[in-house]
Curated annotation (Swiss-Prot):
Lineage of producing organism: Bacteria, Pseudomonadati, Spirochaetota, Spirochaetia, Leptospirales
Entry-linked InterPro entries: Fe2_transport_prot-B, Fe2_transport_prot_B_C, FeoB_GTPase, G_FEOB_dom, Gate_dom, GTP-bd, P-loop_NTPase
Alphabetical list of CDD domains matching this protein: FeoB (cd01879)
Similarity comment: Belongs to the TRAFAC class TrmE-Era-EngA-EngB-Septin-like GTPase superfamily. FeoB GTPase (TC 9.A.8) family.
Species of origin: Leptospira interrogans serogroup Icterohaemorrhagiae serovar Lai (strain 56601)
Protein name: Fe(2+) transporter FeoB
Keywords: Cell inner membrane, Cell membrane, GTP-binding, Ion transport, Iron, Iron transport, Membrane, Nucleotide-binding, Transmembrane, Transmembrane helix, Transport
One of the record's GO molecular function terms: ferrous iron transmembrane transporter activity
FeoB-type G domain mapped to chain residues: 9-172
SUPFAM superfamilies: P-loop containing nucleoside triphosphate hydrolases (SSF52540)
Length: 701
């Protein structure tokens, strides 16, 4: 049963059900030797990695999780196409969830029909042990003719042994045919195969077998996964044969036969004394899945997350502030007074450093979202939110992309590919940018930290943290009402049904969490960092030129000269030009400059204010907060008050200030109309909300 290919360089296709530990295992095998991209012609993320072991170089492709070699969503179609259209020499590493063995084996049976060398890594052994049962892998190996091996991706147990197996020439085995198809079906398949050429015979065999599931033949008309691999003549012949004969094999018959076969195998392979009533919900699920208390629990968990963002990040933020200040001082000691020193200290160090200070909060956000995902809570929150979101025209399938937007809208929008219903998917894409993302946090933290008091309510929750949580809730509520409007106008259709199998509770893998935070933080810095650096240098030039003649102001201090310089600069004139439009929502010309630059990326607002207020490398972020509070207009009144600060927060909550988001919307929708529509409606919403709140506030103040 072995596969004798001894090549030291080969490719492995990793397949398995969602939430089976496949991606965690992928991280354990490849570490940091990963790269991401997109599959050709689609926007589905492609995760590839390499690991070296015993003089072997193994390339691993982590395929999207799926339950079968079918499905209508874009990511599941990719899994089908890659596996069915595998390249010569490819091997399949199937990741099987031992706690959901029957479901995993349903998918494995389909993969075995491809006749490709397979090795099975079995996860969730600890879940079985808690139920006091064991899964005998030796019986499964004998039944299918392939090797099964336990591995724990969370703590690394069995990883070395799995690597040894992977590079062993006898590890990946060609399966023996075990599934007992009835003779009538076999005769039909063989008859059809004999009438076609032998090209792609293994893949063709699977396509034909899988086609028997469809009673109506509808999938054949839409394009069965894998059918496009063959030329027009075989495809036409397949359709004709199935029209006359193939339809008599129904999906229910297929499912029933396989289910009986799998249950028979597992009746012998699963041994032990199982805990009675194991299907009864745990005490935690009785609360977390409750229609009311589940929603309350979700809000409470998110409130604690934002509380931690403020309290836990304080020390590392202070440390980064100190580092930025010391770097500015160090560089300044080697440079003479002049434009170059100003550029490096105020433009580069001050501009970029002002955003780097908020890295601890962004990292904590990525960490908390990763923990919620790995523990299995996100799936439960999706279940609870399904009923609530149904009132607004969406299903629980939209919840995970929306919650992912709390980190970044770009991968969240790409994550909507799992939504089969096109109107639901497009609606989710258009409302996802309303969710508070990590790029908004630097602006929120700066303004909230400067304007709102740092005191506790009930001795637990910080006022600033509650304000941040309120902005998160505002984004969620706005996205729901926007979805309702879109579903009642542009996308009038029924929402898709939401079916989900709740995963077992898991202890998060520290290594997997660290890799997740590292990759997301790296992506954030590599994309936003380049834009911030470019805008900071450009803005420094616009804020410092044309130079004023300081001799005309002999009695003014350096700080007063700095104010005049910025006011008379290119940036100052641009802000003054925008001021009539921004004044009704409470913004002065300095805020106007920040608004203009932040349309490239929201976090640039902080860099812009840092440069405009002359906070350079020798200052800290606290000095920027003080500069905001001390700033006065021509009449001596404070520029930054509670009313226009709230107006600014609302503008940033609703405006689409992210070129990357607009770019990915264009790519996902394959249309220029929808990103333009997104930008327009969010800008109008942001301005209108800020205008109403500021004007009403002024009316009653």
């Amino acid at each position: 049963m072995g596969h004798s290919d001894s090549s030291k360089t080969f490719r492995i296709l990793m397949a398995g059900n969602p939430n089976c530990g496949k991606s965690t295992l992928f991280n354990q095998l490849t570490g940091l030797r990963q790269k991401t991209g997109n599959y050709h012609g689609v926007t589905v993320e492609k995760a590839e990695g390499i690991f070296h072991h015993l003089d072997h170089s193994v390339k691993i492709l982590d395929l999207p999780g799926a339950f079968s070699l079918g499905g209508s969503s874009e990511d599941k179609q990719i899994t089908s196409r890659v596996l069915i259209g595998h390249e010569a020499g490819d091997r399949i590493l199937f990741v099987m969830d031992a706690s959901l063995a029957e479901r995993s084996l349903q998918f494995l049976l389909q993969i075995l029909e491809l006749n490709v060398p397979v090795l099975v890594a079995v996860t969730m052994k600890d879940v079985l042990e808690k139920k006091r049962v064991q899964l005998r892998l030796d019986l499964l190996s004998n039944e299918f003719g392939i090797l099964f091996q336990y591995v724990n991706p969370k703590n690394g147990e069995g990883i070395k042994e799995l690597k040894d197996r992977i590079v062993s020439p006898k590890a990946f085995c060609l399966p023996i045919r075990s599934f007992p198809w009835d003779s009538e079906r076999e005769n039909f398949l063989n008859d059809l195969l004999n009438s076609l050429s032998t090209e792609h015979s293994n893949s063709l065999k699977f396509v034909l077998t899988n086609s028997l599931k469809e009673l109506s033949g509808e999938i054949l008309q839409k394009g069965l996964p894998g059918l496009s691999l063959f030329s027009e003549t075989p495809s036409k012949l397949i359709r004709e044969k199935f029209e006359r004969f193939g339809k008599r094999f129904t999906y229910l018959e297929e499912l029933t036969q396989k289910s009986i076969y799998i249950k028979k195998i597992l009746s012998n392979a699963i041994v032990g004394d199982p805990i009675p009533n194991e299907r009864v919900l745990s005490k935690a699920d009785k609360i977390l899945l409750h229609p009311f208390w589940g929603l309350v629990s979700f809000l409470g968990i998110m409130a604690l997350v934002f509380q931690a963002l403020f309290t836990w990040s304080e020390m590392p933020m202070d440390w980064i502030e100190s580092c930025v200040r010391n770097v500015g001082t160090f560089v300044g000691d080697f440079l003479e007074e002049g434009p170059l020193r100003s550029l490096i200290q105020e433009g580069i160090i001050g501009g970029v450093g002002a955003v780097l200070v908020f890295i601890p909060q962004i990292s904590l956000l990525f960490l908390f979202i990763g923990i919620l995902e790995e523990t299995g809570y996100i799936a439960r929150a999706s279940f609870v939110m399904d009923r609530f979101m149904g009132k607004f025209g969406l299903s629980g399938k939209s919840f995970i992309p929306l919650l992912s937007s709390a980190a970044c809208a770009v991968p969240a929008i790409m994550g909507t590919r799992t939504i089969e219903n096109k109107s639901d998917r497009l609606t989710t894409i258009l409302v996802s940018p309303l969710i508070t993302c990590s790029a908004r946090y630097p602006v929120y933290v700066l303004v909230i930290g400067a304007i709102f008091p740092s005191k506790n309510i009930l001795g637990i929750f910080n006022v600033q943290a509650l304000t941040m949580f309120g902005l998160f809730l505002l984004g969620m509520i706005a996205s729901m009402f926007a979805a309702l409007v879109f579903k009642k106008t542009f996308f009038k259709s029924d929402s898709s049904y939401f079916l989900i199998e709740l995963p077992a509770y898991n202890t998060p893998s520290i290594k997997s969490l660290a890799l997740t935070v590292f990759k997301k933080l790296k992506a954030f810095l590599s994309t936003a960092g380049q834009i911030i650096l470019f805008i900071s240098i450009l803005l420094w030039f616009l804020a410092n030129y044309p130079r004023i003649d300081s001799s005309l102001y002999p009695n003014l201090t350096d700080a007063e000269l700095k104010k005049i310089q910025i006011r008379e600069s290119y940036a100052g004139h641009s802000g003054k030009f925008m001021e009539p439009v921004l004044k009704p929502i409470g913004f002065d010309w300095k805020m106007g400059i920040g608004i203009i630059t932040s349309f490239a990326a929201r976090e640039i607002m902080v860099s812009t204010l840092s440069i405009i207020y002359g906070v350079g490398g020798e200052e800290s972020t606290d000095d920027l907060k003080e500069a905001l509070l001390k700033d006065t207009d021509e009449n001596g009144k404070p520029v930054w008050g509670l009313s226009n600060s709230v107006s600014l927060l609302l503008f940033f909550a609703f405006a689409c200030q992210c070129m990357s988001t607009l770019a990915v919307v264009k790519k996902e929708t394959n249309s220029i109309f929808w990103p333009l529509f997104l930008f327009t409606y969010m800008t109008i919403l942001a301005y209108s909300t800020s205008f109403i709140v500021f004007q009403v506030w002024q009316l009653f103040s």
